[in-house]
Amino acid sequence: ETGTDVTSFRIVSFSESGFSAELVGIDTDNAVVTVNFLQTGRFPVTMNIRMGLSYKATSTITDQYGAGAVEFARVEDKPFTVTAQNGETREWTLRTTYMPQLQNADFERWANLQTPLPKGIKGSPYWASANMTSPVVVEGTTQTEGAPGQGKAVQMETKNTIIGKLAAGSLFLGWFDDSNPMGNMNDPAVMMFYGIPFSSNQPIKGMQVDILYHPGNGPSSDSGSLAIELIRQRDLSQELEYHGANPDGTWHSKNNADRVARGHSIVATQAGTLDNGDTADLVVPDNTWQTVFVPLEYDGAYPAYTHLTVTFSSSSKGDSYKGAVGSILKIDNIRLIYE
């Protein structure tokens, strides 16, 4: 210790609801304490802290016992001074960032065996699945056990239906319109409303996720898909309607938003061209938990966006009703990775 060091930092509470934050780190060389807001409510807000210092040092943001209260009008930096016992001073910065993570991305909270919380519904989108309801009672997305010591996870399974069409297990950020499933069988994309409002003050590099994959009928029989997308709504006065692309790759005619960045990976247990025509860029051991990274790609400068979605499917060509019955994709511990 040099006499003017910050040795520890803990966030105790906030004066307002809707806020959460985590300590990123203490950079002694550059005299910076970095805190990341995971969730923000209505500013201004007071962050109550406990901060450890060098022996008998004091600071301008804490009392003699190390307790302090720092008010923020926004996500902003706050300078403070640490004074050593001998009177030496050093200027520090309490740096804040806003790099939120997805709610319940470790999938420990469920309403029931089929519905992770928060549940995506019209007007309040979040975790949703095309398997939440079906005219043929397909329960392809369910709660399962994660890797050892990791609690609960999500399992997506590709199944047959009584009407002869294959149904892939799916999960995405948004909401699913189950009002007319039989009438929309020729346009399944129209039932998926992708996207949740999202913002950060740092660019997103991609997403990290724990996965387990098992193809239903041998190594070449099927592949799963993992994707992350940034979406920009054209007119913010309207309600977002974004169905992504049709199975043939064309954009859905009802979209009122544009995809401005995407990361997409095909996961399989075998390299090369698979029976469904896809080629995996993530080749993993069968039925074994792995941590993978899906990079976000875009042209030019980092794009402005209004919404974000992530999508997962146990059969990567499931929107074309292609795949293998019994294919399983398990996911857990999704984490957005920032630059």
Where are these regions (language model features)?
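Extracellular carbohydrate recognition and processing domains
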Residues: 239-304
